[in-house]
């Protein structure tokens, strides 16, 4: 990927700021998401809650299914690949996907190495639990970061933890003296140039979205108030009682995240929320994958 292409990919990700990206498993769901105001959709054969329930090995979705969703909507379409599976990424780039999510939700293909995202023209989004993980993914070529949270649970606690951790580590880096940055870069195993950017600007070099456990308009607004620049919503929409209404409410909540009166209105009469899973009671944490 050339320097110009990298700059373009970062600018493309900037265009999604303030938006909601929704997991969808069919063209019909994709249309619901688009009509609700989603800025992009994530094409999946199974949403994270179903992946978690089924267990086993979870892989990239069928390209034919992804193409069906691409043909159904005019907004960007994303799709997930396994961590380290660069051939799945090559396939998605070949079908002209708009974004690739190298995702811990799927079973990792490589337990040591992530994809060298700099070799691709298509932009990548990756999950991170802290500043070190985020900057390592950016060094590999990611142009968007999201909290890992704990997908498929409807429990926001992990996403909150990851966002607060990242924010506190950014504040610490900003407070460092110039000569202390080198030690911090060594400890985090990240390039000094990326840590220098964080020190000078007080933020990541790429956009930072929230993901993992967002189930209500209040959850989405919480993550925005904590500093997220947008929100991914997975199982929380289409595992709920009224997906269309909940989807629209989450989109409006992200736009009006500092307006409690509006949030109260948006939270009314949404039907039953997804049945959640307490993240502390789970034996396999997806967020542990890919450091």
From Swiss-Prot:
Binding-site residues, D-ribose 5-phosphate: 23, 152, 213, 234-235
Q: Write the record's keywords in alphabetical order, separated by commas.
A: Lyase, Pyridoxal phosphate, Schiff base
What does UniProt list as catalytic?
80 (schiff-base intermediate with d-ribose 5-phosphate)
Alphabetized InterPro entries for the sequence: Aldolase_TIM (IPR013785), PdxS/SNZ (IPR001852), PdxS/SNZ_N (IPR033755), RibuloseP-bd_barrel (IPR011060)
Recorded GO MF terms: pyridoxal 5'-phosphate synthase (glutamine hydrolysing) activity
Q: Which PROSITE patterns does this UniProt record tie to the protein?
A: PDXS_SNZ_1 (PS01235), PDXS_SNZ_2 (PS51129)
Q: Among its keywords, does the record have Plastid?
A: no
Q: Which GO terms describe its biological process?
A: amino acid metabolic process; pyridoxal phosphate biosynthetic process; pyridoxine biosynthetic process
Q: What class of enzyme is it?
A: lyase
Q: What pathway is it annotated to?
A: Cofactor biosynthesis; pyridoxal 5'-phosphate biosynthesis
List the Gene3D superfamilies: Aldolase class I
State the Pfam families in the record.
Answer: SOR_SNZ
Q: What does it catalyze?
A: aldehydo-D-ribose 5-phosphate + D-glyceraldehyde 3-phosphate + L-glutamine = pyridoxal 5'-phosphate + L-glutamate + phosphate + 3 H2O + H(+)
Record-listed E.C. numbers: 4.3.3.6
What's the superkingdom here?
Answer: Archaea
Query: Which parts of the sequence bind D-glyceraldehyde 3-phosphate?
Result: 164
Family per similarity comment: Belongs to the PdxS/SNZ family.
Subunit structure of this chain's protein:
In the presence of PdxT, forms a dodecamer of heterodimers.
Its function? Catalyzes the formation of pyridoxal 5'-phosphate from ribose 5-phosphate (RBP), glyceraldehyde 3-phosphate (G3P) and ammonia. The ammonia is provided by the PdxT subunit. Can also use ribulose 5-phosphate and dihydroxyacetone phosphate as substrates, resulting from enzyme-catalyzed isomerization of RBP and G3P, respectively.
This protein is called Pyridoxal 5'-phosphate synthase subunit PdxS
- List the taxonomic lineage: Archaea, Methanobacteriati, Methanobacteriota, Stenosarchaea group, Methanomicrobia
Question: What gene, per UniProt, encodes this protein?
Answer: pdxS
């Amino acid at each position: 990927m050339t320097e110009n292409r990298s700059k373009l990919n970062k600018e493309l990700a900037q265009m999604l700021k303030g938006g909601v990206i929704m997991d969808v498993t069919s063209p019909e769901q994709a249309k619901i998401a688009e009509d609700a105001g989603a800025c992009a959709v994530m094409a999946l054969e199974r949403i994270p809650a179903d992946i978690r329930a089924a267990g086993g090995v979870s892989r990239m979705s069928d390209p034919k299914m992804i193409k069906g969703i691409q043909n159904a909507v005019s907004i960007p379409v994303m799709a997930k690949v396994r961590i380290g599976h660069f051939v799945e990424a090559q396939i998605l780039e070949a079908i002209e996907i708009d974004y690739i999510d190298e995702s811990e939700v799927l079973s990792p293909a490589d337990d040591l190495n992530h994809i060298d995202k700099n070799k691709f023209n298509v932009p990548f989004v990756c999950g991170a639990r802290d500043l070190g993980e985020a900057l390592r993914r950016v060094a590999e070529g990611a142009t968007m970061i999201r909290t890992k949270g704990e997908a498929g649970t409807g429990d926001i606690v992990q996403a909150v933890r990851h966002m607060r951790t990242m924010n506190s580590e950014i504040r610490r880096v900003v407070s460092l003296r110039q000569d202390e940055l080198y030690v911090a870069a060594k400890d985090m195993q990240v390039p000094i140039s990326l840590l220098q950017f964080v020190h000078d600007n007080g933020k990541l070099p790429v956009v930072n979205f929230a993901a993992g456990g967002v189930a209500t308009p209040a959850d989405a607004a919480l993550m925005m108030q904590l500093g997220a620049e947008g929100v991914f919503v997975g199982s929380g929409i289409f595992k709920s009682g009224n997906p269309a209404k909940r989807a629209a409410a989450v989109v409006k909540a992200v736009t009006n995240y500092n307006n409690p009166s509006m949030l109260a209105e948006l939270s009314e009469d949404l039907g039953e929320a997804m049945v959640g899973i307490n993240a502390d009671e789970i034996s396999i944490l997806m967020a542990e994958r890919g450091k």
